[in-house]
């Protein structure tokens, strides 16, 4: 079956040149008369004094430039340190440095490793505005992305008082990895998000790596009943675990004055996932440590005791283990519940780069035991699905997962400028059995259905060699959903193509001879930003009589979900 659409970006790769050529100047109309006093000191060092009455200092960025280190100094004290790829020959975009909160203070910046001849000195400006309105034509519409800057792992996802909080790894000073903060957004429905100020910023212990949040309903930590408590990795030359807490439903956080709360001699020691274990009446922390997960317990979120380790001889080990999660789920069609340990690995994914594996088993408050040590189970068979974790305290005990929709092989090279990276759609997790094994299924959360407009039905037809549906939609803006239900009448291979008038296509096919489903994006558009992006990925499927495909298309991505009358499987290319 061939299916055509006027506009489809099969990868984050097609329209950036056009977008940049037609972009509106983000500084148009901004007041720039306020003073910036620049003193060059030689050997790449400069002192810049700015007018504290302005809200922002707008820094020009050129992504091909090396990083310069900036020290923000207020009344002779360093209050912020960060790196920026300052424009040397051209300006790719601007990033804001927030000066609010320092009115009537003396503000200066110590710039290091920035040449005196660089263009940045001429282009930096003071302003009371920063235009973060979208200038990227192919920014996803219903996958979350930052207003500007770099994003990777989802962090600290927690639900409280009708609000879903999404924190995430964030660089507000550029669209490449670095300067890790916790960004923040809030939603009431998992679909529509409101950007919030940075939640947690770097400090003397280091930048802010991944972690989790809990609602301390019974005030076990003593910060206050109902406090949102955040756990994160403070990263510098070494990695240690720290905590912060919020008493205003996540709007602001105060760092614990006795950080760090957990240390180690291990170099890779990060990404704490914390949850309450009712049976043992303790908090549990799962930490990624090299190529294993370590489990700790605590009565009060402050004092932690080592319990056990998991990982040796289990699953894939071609890369570092990261971003753990440990959740309990009922098994569909039974009265059983089992525990799932989610483990993200980089590199070592089935198709190169980063990916998410998981283990099913038991957990007694001290030790996790994998019920199938000989098997490696993958949560998603697309190449752009990593750092998967679930919301804490979700209503009705739902286990709602979110992933970073990218891959470390090429994440920094994806050709967007205003921002980089998006998340997967939220997915509800469940367990099911197949051939004596227990597997994890993930289905787009039912809130996604609210996005549907009026359906355009194409009716029932038989396919003899090929059948073309043209156009597949009479009108759309690059965001749509396709549902295909079909029966096989004896074919060994069934293929589908989604293509446009430019000859760009994504090909999908079932191979009933070896029970695999393949999605091929090698001809999906401009893929030359990375040698490893243009790939075909395959997933095992269950033989069945009837099949359902669900395609979620959102400007820069395709997520494919597969179900049949035999089992629930998931193939995602987000």
Which positions does each model-derived feature cover?
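Bacterial N-terminal signal peptides that target proteins for export
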Residues: 2-13
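Bacterial N-terminal signal peptides
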Residues: 13-23
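Bacterial Sec-dependent signal peptides at the C-terminal "C-region" and cleavage site
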Residues: 23-33
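Beta-rich carbohydrate-recognition and catalytic domains
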Residues: 32-272, 276-322, 330-381, 396, ...
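Glycine-aromatic-enriched beta-strand/loop faces of beta-sandwich-type recognition domains
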Residues: 256-259, 502-546
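Secretory/extracellular carbohydrate-interaction modules
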Residues: 465-521
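Short tryptophan-centered beta-strand motifs in secreted/extracellular beta-sheet-rich domains
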Residues: 482-484, 545-555, 559-561
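Conserved small/polar residues in nucleotide/adenosyl-binding loops
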Residues: 562-569
